[in-house]
Amino acid sequence: MSTKSSPARGTVYIPGHAMTLRSVELKKIPIKVLKTVFENAQKISPVWSLEQASLNSLAATAETMLPGPILGPSRAEHFNGPDPTIPDKMVVRMVEGDHKMLFRATLDDTYHILVTRIRVREKFVQRLARAMYTRRASMLMDVELPFKDKMEGVYAAADLEAICKMHYWVFPHTVPAPNMKSPDDKAYLTSVAQFARSTKFIESYMYYMRPHDPEVNSTDTGNRVAAMLIYIHGMQCKLASLFDALDAAILRSKFNAGSRGHSLSGIYGFTRNGKGTMMAAKSSGNVVEQIRRTCPFGSDAMVECLISALDRMTYLVARWELMSVDKRDDAKAAIAAGMGLAWLLNGHLSYLTNMIMTVYVLWLPEHYLNPRLILTISSRVLLGQLLCTSHTTFRENATCPKMLLAQNAVEWKKQERGTAAWLDYVCARAWLRASRENRKPANITAMNNTLEEISAHVLKILEEAPQPAASAPSSLCATNYCPDSPPSRPPPPPPVQKRAKDPGRFSRIMAGDDRRASVQSREDGSGYMTCEHTASTSTKLRGRVLSAPLIRHRRKSAEGLQGAAKLRGGSLRLPDNGGRAALPSEPPPSSESTDTSPEARPETDHK
C-alpha cells in the first residue's frame, strides 16, 4: 500500500481511489490513523488454519493456553436464547475466580523472558524515563535540567523500545510518588494502587466477556465494546492532561531560566488558569454520560469500574496540577513519577485497544471502519504527535524521543498466543459450520475485505455523510465528540424573523403618501426608508447604504420605464422609493391615475 500524505487536504492515495477524509462519521482522519487501521487489520484465514491442522488439534492447542471458563460448556448456553449475551454476573464470577491472573499468563511469560535476556531493573527504567523527558524538555521547551542520564550504548535501540513497551507488565506496582509531605505521599500511592486494581478488573472483564462464536450477533457485546472505546478515548485525554501538568510544573520551576516554552496546553491553543488546565476540563466532558448511555443496563459492574477508574485518574491529574519542583531532587522524583504513571496508563490502554483490534472488532458495526474505533486510534496518534510538536514551529520534531510506545495489534497477537489460538479455533469451527449450511460467515468474511473494498466503503460513507460545520472541533484528543452518538446538547432554535409592526403604514410609507410616518420610521429604524435625498447625502434602502449617484441612476431608470408606458398609451405609478419595484404588500397601481410629477414632464413633451 502506497500512501501520500498532504497536511493541507488530508488525502490518502490508495490504488484506484483518492479519498478526501472530510465527513461527520470519519471526522478528519489523519493519514497515520488509516495506515494504522490497514496495517493492524487481522486477516482471518480459517482455510489456511484447517490446512495446517485439524479442528481437534486447534481445539487442543487452545485449551492448553486458555483458562477453563473460556471454552467451557456454560458459555454457549447463554447464546441459545432470544437475547444472546453473557450476563454481567457470570463475567464478574469468572473475573473473581481468576486469582492467579491466568488471563495474562502468556504475556507475563513473554515479557519476563525478555527481562531475563536483557537484564533490566527498575532503577534503569526510571533513568531511561528521565533521560527521555530531559531530552524532550531541552528540544521542545528550551529548558535545560541540571541532570542528564545518558542511555547511549547501554542497550540497543530495539531493546530500549521493548523496555518502554513492557514497563506496564513487568513493573506495574512500582510507580513511585513525587516528593510530597507524608500524608499527601501516602494518599497519592493509595490512589495509584486503587487505579492499578481497577485496570486489572477492566482487562480481565474484557478478556472473559467474549462470545463463544464469532458469527453470533450479540448486541450487548457491541455495547460493551463501544463503552470501552469511549473509556479509552477519555483516558487518552487524561493522559494528555497529565503530560500538560508535568510540563507546566517544570516550566514554573527555577530551572526555567527565561525560556518561553509552552506546555502541551499551549500547543492545543488553551491557556492555563489557577485551577488547572482548560484542556483537563475539556477532556472530562461527558465521558461518564456517554458510557451510561451506551450501556444503560446489563453491564453494571463494568460501567461502575470504568467510571471509578476515570474518577481516580482525574484525582491523580488534579494532584499533578498543584505540583511544584524547585529542587533538583524534586525534579528528578517528579519526572520519574510522572513518566511511570503515564506508562502505566499507556500500557493499560494499549492492552484494551489491541484486544479490540484483534478479537472484539468481529462484533463491532463496520468492523475496522467503526467510527468509535477510528476516533480512539486517532486520539492515540494525535497525542503521540503532540508530545513531539514544537511550540514555535507547530511541527512534529522527528528527532524528539517518543514518550509513549505501545505494541500494535500484529506484535501483540504474537505475544498473546492464547488469544491467537482461540481465534484460530473458533473461526475455523464457524467456517466449517457455514460450509455445511451453504452460506458464508458474515463477520469472518467482513474481516477479510480487500483494500479496494475497504476504500470503496469509505467513499460510500463520505458521499452519504453531510458536510461538517465550519465550527466543528478539529482536535480529536481535546474533545469528547463521538460521531455515532446522539448530540449531548439540543440544536439551537431557528432565528426569529422580525415582521413589520404596521403593514398598512408600511404601504403608505413605500408609496410616499405619509411623510410624517416616513420620518417616524427613519427615527425608530422600523420599516423601509423613502428616497428623499440631495446630491451629497446617502440613504438606507432595505438595510443597504446607497450613494447619491446610484440613486440618480435608479431615478433615470424609473423615468425611462414611465416614458415607455406612456408611449404605449397607459400610465405607470412609481412609488417614491428610488425606482425600486413595489413589494407584494403594496396596492396595485390604478390604470386611471395620471402622473403629475415633475419627472414625467419630459416624456409628456415628447408625446
Swiss-Prot record:
Pfam families according to UniProt: Herpes_UL46
Keyword annotations of the record: Activator, Host cell membrane, Host membrane, Membrane, Transcription, Transcription regulation, Virion, Virion tegument
Pro residues bias locations: 484-496
Superkingdom per UniProt: Viruses
Chief localization: virion
A GO BP entry: regulation of DNA-templated transcription
Region feature (Disordered): 473-540, 557-607
Mode of membrane association: Peripheral membrane protein
GO cellular component: host cell plasma membrane; membrane; viral tegument
Subcellular location: Virion tegument; Host cell membrane
Function (record text): Abundant tegument protein. Trans-activates the immediate early genes.
Family under the similarity heading: Belongs to the herpesviridae HHV-1 VP11/12 protein family.
Name of protein: Alpha trans-inducing factor
Species of origin: Psittacid herpesvirus 1 (isolate Amazon parrot/-/97-0001/1997) (PsHV-1)
Gene: UL46
